[in-house]
Amino acid sequence: CVSVMHSSRHFQQWNSHPEHWKIWRGYDFGFSKPFSVGWYAADERGRLYRIKELYGCTGTPNEGLRKDPMEQARMIREAEENDPLLKGRVILGVADPAIFDESRGESIADMQEKSPNFLHWMPGDHTRLAGKMQFHYRLAFGEDGRPMLQVFNTCKHFIRTIPNLVYDESNVEDIDTTQEDHIYDECRYVLMENPISAAKHTQPPPMLDDPLDMDPRKDKTRFMRI
């Protein structure tokens, strides 16, 4: 799904960002499976930077920490109070719409909005095909050679999981949801709050190691009409 990612341009790091940039927080709740929180800065051109992540994983892939909603909220608030990129900033939170479900009692969103954590969430747009296309649009290289989504190299779980996602064989319009897709979902909610159109002019991705010479750009064959 996102095999177009290349470390030289998609991944980066810096220590500060302008105060007027918007900060977004995406959230995918999990208990037996990992929960995922990602923080994103949006610049004047609409480019998003994933600047920090909190991933509730035991260290075994796709195994959650089994933290309850209030403990997850405490961890999120602690991260925002201790990170200089986030401390004191107004942060817009968008999350899986499922956390607003009140059919079995108080919703996760309501629990996390209470004292002492005061986390406010908006329900994310869960439209899967449109969200997948936003990933493609964001990761494509524009005329300036840069994608519209860049990821700090400290976001290790994004870098580990996102490039490995594959399509669902029974529904090729979507990814296989049996995979470790929690970061994908959390990021998708933020992308859908900041939609962009497909770039009119894109650059091909840089060539990677190709020991079997499978990249057609290496083909030196030329055909002449005679």
Residue ranges and their predicted role:
Residues 29-31, 97:
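Short, flexible loop/turn elements at secondary-structure junctions
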Residues 46-176, 197-202, 206-207, 212-213, ...:
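Mg2+-dependent endonuclease catalytic cores in nucleic-acid-processing enzymes, primarily RNase H-like
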Residues 32-34, 101:
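Extended hydrophobic secondary-structure segments
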Residues 177-203:
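Acidic, Mg2+-coordinating catalytic module of metal-dependent nucleases/exonucleases
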Residues 35-40, 188:
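Short beta-strand scaffold segments in enzyme catalytic cores
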Residues 1-29:
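ATPase catalytic-site recognition across NTP-hydrolyzing enzymes
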Residues 35, 91, 184:
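Residue-level detector of short, conserved catalytic/binding motifs and their immediate flanks
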